[in-house]
UniProtKB/Swiss-Prot annotation:
One term of GO molecular function: microtubule plus-end binding
The entry's keywords: Chaperone, Cytoplasm, Cytoskeleton, Microtubule, Phosphoprotein
Residues carrying Phosphoserine: S213
InterPro entries: CAP-Gly_dom_sf, CAP-Gly_domain, Ubiquitin-like_dom, Ubiquitin-like_domsf
Stated name of the protein: Cell polarity protein alp11
Gene that this sequence comes from: alp11
Length: 234
C-alpha cells in the first residue's frame, strides 16, 4: 500500500512525514516520539482531514492494534498529538531558563578579537562612531521641538485609520514601546483600541478597556470630529 503524506502537529513541533497505512496506531505513536517528545502512553492522537467534507477521528486506546489504513486517512491531513501528562511533567523545549548555559565574563568578551563587539569597534559603528553622541543629542533636540509643536493638539478631537474617532489624551515618549519616537495616546469613542491607556502596567491616560491606543503622529488626523450623538435622528 502506498505511503501518504501527513502533517504532524503538537505544542512543540510541526512536521511533515510519510505514513505507511500498514502501520498500527501503536507503531505510529512509537515513530512520533522523536518528533514530538511525548512518550507513546501519553499521546492522544486526533486526525484532521485536509477537506472539511471528510470526517476527522479521535484515536482511542481500543484502536492501538488497528492498521492506519482502516481509518481512510487522506493525503495532506494532520495528526494532532496532545500530551496528556500533567503540565509539571512535560518537557518545555521553549523554556531556555532551564538549560545550563555558559556565560562569558564581560571583560573576556570585550577582549576578544573575533566578536561582533570587536567588529563594531574596528568599524566605528553604533556607540563607537565618533558622531554617535552628537547624533543622539541631535535626535533628542528634534524630538523636543516636535513635542512642543504637537502639544497644542492635546485634548483635541481626532480621526485614526479605519474611521476611528476619539480624543488625544497623551503626547510624548513611551519607553515601554521605544525611546526613538513620540507617541500620541488616543481615547477612542468606541472599543476599537488596544488598551485602556496603559502600556506594560504603566498608565499614561484613562480610558475604558479597548478604548485606548498609542499611535504615531502621522497616523492621527486632528480636526472637527464631534462625538457621534446616538440620539440624533430619533
Amino acid at each position: 500500500m502506498n505511503e501518504i503524506t501527513l502533517f504532524i502537529k503538537s505544542s512543540s513541533a510541526n512536521a511533515e512525514r510519510r505514513i505507511n497505512p500498514q502501520w498500527t496506531v501503536s507503531q505510529l505513536k512509537t515513530k512520533l516520539v522523536p518528533i514530538v517528545g511525548t512518550p507513546e502512553q501519553y499521546q492522544k492522537l486526533t486526525y484532521e482531514p485536509a477537506s472539511s467534507t471528510v470526517p476527522g477521528h479521535v484515536f482511542t486506546s481500543e484502536e492501538e492494534n488497528l492498521d492506519l489504513g482502516e481509518f481512510k486517512l487522506q493525503p495532506l491531513g494532520t495528526i494532532v498529538v496532545e500530551d496528556t501528562r500533567p503540565p509539571h511533567l512535560r518537557l518545555d523545549f521553549d523554556d531556555l531558563s532551564q538549560v545550563d548555559k555558559y556565560v562569558m565574563p564581560r571583560e573576556q568578551y570585550e577582549n576578544r578579537t573575533d566578536s561582533v563587539y570587536a567588529w563594531k569597534k574596528r568599524n566605528q559603528l553604533g556607540r563607537f562612531n565618533p558622531d554617535f553622541e552628537a547624533s543622539k543629542a541631535s535626535r533628542q533636540e528634534s524630538l523636543k521641538r516636535e513635542l512642543v509643536d504637537l502639544q497644542k493638539n492635546l485634548n483635541s478631537r481626532c480621526c485614526a485609520a479605519g474611521e476611528r474617532y476619539g480624543t488625544i489624551r497623551y503626547i510624548g515618549l513611551v519607553p515601554e514601546i521605544n525611546n526613538d519616537n513620540l507617541w500620541v495616546g488616543v481615547e477612542f469613542d468606541e472599543p476599537v483600541g488596544k488598551n485602556d491607556g496603559t502600556v506594560s502596567g504603566k498608565r499614561y491616560f484613562n480610558a475604558k478597556n479597548k478604548h485606548g491606543s498609542f499611535l504615531r503622529s502621522s497616523e492621527v488626523e486632528v480636526g472637527d470630529f464631534p462625538p457621534e450623538d446616538i440620539l440624533e435622528g430619533l
